[in-house]
C-alpha cells in the first residue's frame, strides 16, 4: 500500500516537473543551448525522490575527481531503471543515450525529449553509432557531457559484462575524457513485485577520468578493456566494503 501511494506521488511530481521543464526549455533556450536549466530541474526531482523515504541512503564517492568545467563521456554499469536517477547525484550537466523504445515510455519518454537526450535505434547498428557520434559531439560542443551504459543492456546478475564500442568511439571522435562511474544498490531498490525496498542503500563511485590523450593513444578495444577492468575492480571494492560494514553491525 505504501509503495502504491509513493508511485502515485511520483506521477504527480513528474507531471509538475514535466510542465516546469517545458516552460524552462521555452524561456531559457535562447541563452541555454546546453539545457542546463532543464537538467537542474531533473536533479531537483531526483533529490525529492530519494529524500522522502526516511531510510533510503545514497553515498557518492569520488565527487572531487570531477572537473565541472569539462565535458566527459560518462560510462556507467547498468542494472535497473534506478541507475538513471542515481547518476544525477554527480555534479555535471549531461545527456543520456538511450534506445528508441525507452522514448515511448509514458512520462519517462517525455522527460528524455525535454532533456534533449540522444535516441538511437539499436536495430540499425551502423546508423545508431553514426547518430551517437554526431549528436554526442553536438552536446559536448555545447558544454554538456554524454552518459552511456556501455554494456548496452541491463545486467541480470549485477555483474559488469562486455562493453560495446559506442561510448569509446564517441570519446575518441570528440577528443573527450572518459569518466567511469560505478553504481551499487540500485538493483535492490525495487523488488520483483514492484514494491519499494524501504531500507535500501545506493553507492555512486566516481573513478579517476581517462585523460583525452590516453583515449586518443589507445586502440578502441584496449580502451574498452582498461575501463572495464577498472570498473569491475571498483565494484568489487564497493561491495566488499559494504559487507565489512554489515559484519560490524
Language-model segments: residues:
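Catalytic core of membrane glycerolipid acyltransferases/transacylases, capturing the structured
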Residues: 21-40, 52-53, 68-125
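Thr-Gly-centered strand-to-loop micro-motif
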Residues: 61, 97-99, 120-122, 150, ...
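Short gly/ser/thr-rich secondary-structure transition/capping motifs
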Residues: 53-61, 129-130, 186-188
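Glycine-rich helix-loop-beta junction characteristic of Rossmann-like nucleotide cofactor-binding loops
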Residues: 62-67
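Non-catalytic C-terminal accessory region of glycerolipid acyltransferases
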Residues: 130-249
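N-terminal membrane-anchoring alpha-helices
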Residues: 1-57
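Generic preference for hydrophobic
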Residues: 60, 74, 96, 204-206
Amino acid at each position: 500500500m505504501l509503495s502504491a501511494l509513493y508511485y502515485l506521488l511520483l506521477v504527480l511530481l513528474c507531471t509538475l516537473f514535466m510542465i516546469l521543464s517545458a516552460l524552462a526549455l521555452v524561456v531559457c533556450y535562447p541563452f541555454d543551448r546546453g539545457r542546463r536549466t532543464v537538467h537542474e530541474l531533473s536533479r531537483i526531482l531526483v533529490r525529492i525522490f530519494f529524500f522522502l523515504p526516511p531510510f533510503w541512503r545514497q553515498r557518492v564517492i569520488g565527487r572531487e575527481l570531477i572537473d565541472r568545467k569539462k565535458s566527459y563521456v560518462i560510462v556507467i554499469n547498468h542494472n535497473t531503471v534506478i541507475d538513471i536517477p542515481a547518476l544525477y547525484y554527480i555534479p555535471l550537466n549531461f545527456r543520456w543515450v538511450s534506445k528508441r523504445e525507452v522514448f515511448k515510455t509514458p512520462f519517462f519518454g517525455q522527460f528524455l525529449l525535454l532533456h534533449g537526450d540522444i535516441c538511437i535505434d539499436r536495430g540499425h547498428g551502423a546508423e545508431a553509432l553514426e547518430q551517437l557520434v554526431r549528436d554526442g559531439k553536438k552536446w559536448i560542443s555545447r558544454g554538456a557531457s554524454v552518459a552511456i551504459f556501455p554494456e548496452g543492456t541491463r545486467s541480470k546478475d549485477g555483474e559488469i559484462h562486455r562493453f560495446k564500442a559506442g561510448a569509446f568511439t564517441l570519446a575518441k571522435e570528440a577528443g573527450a575524457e572518459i569518466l567511469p562511474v560505478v553504481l551499487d544498490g540500485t538493483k535492490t531498490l525495487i523488488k520483483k513485485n514492484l514494491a519499494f525496498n524501504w531500507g535500501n542503500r545506493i553507492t555512486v563511485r566516481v573513478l579517476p577520468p581517462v585523460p583525452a590523450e590516453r583515449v586518443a593513444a589507445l586502440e578502441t578495444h584496449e580502451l574498452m578493456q582498461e575501463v572495464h577492468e577498472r570498473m569491475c575492480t571498483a565494484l568489487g571494492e564497493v561491495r566488499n566494503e559494504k559487507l565489512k560494514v554489515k559484519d560490524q553491525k
